[in-house]
Amino acid sequence: MSYPNRSYVEHVAVRVRDIHWHIRFFREALGMTIRAVDGDAAAPKQVWTVGGIQLVADPGFAGPEGRLAHLGVMTGDLDAALAAAYAFEGVLPLAQGRNWLQLPDGLCVEVMQATGTTVERALAIDPRG
């Protein structure tokens, strides 16, 4: 079956108590590059790696370390994706904007509009091949 809209996971956001430890781990253990920092580099609110990990500083977080904050999905047609998503029973909008959804099990998804042929190019990459 073919679906009219194509999308890919652009990032996964994870709440962490100690953002500096996680930055060091992803850099030093896995060789990942930080591509963006929100806030002062000495005390970042959040950082993004090349490859799609977003670390969100949340020092007071009471849940288990590494709690998923949200999935970020890049799509070729935002309006079509949102219409299809909201057609599912139990999908709710979130306060962040119309492109933020909460699924029935509590998972939050940020749906973003891709530019140009970004989706096609990303889906053409076979990281295992």
What do the predicted segments below correspond to?
Residues 2-7, 13-54:
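Core segments of cupin and vicinal oxygen chelate
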Residues 1-23, 66-73, 115-129:
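N-terminal beta-strand motif that seeds the catalytic metal site of vicinal oxygen chelate
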Residues 1-5, 8-17, 35, 46-49, 61-129:
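Vicinal oxygen chelate
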Residues 21-28, 42-46, 60, 67-69, ...:
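Generic alpha-helix signal with a bias toward terminal, lower-confidence helices
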Residues 33-67, 101-119:
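Conserved short beta-strand elements that form part of the metal-binding/catalytic scaffold
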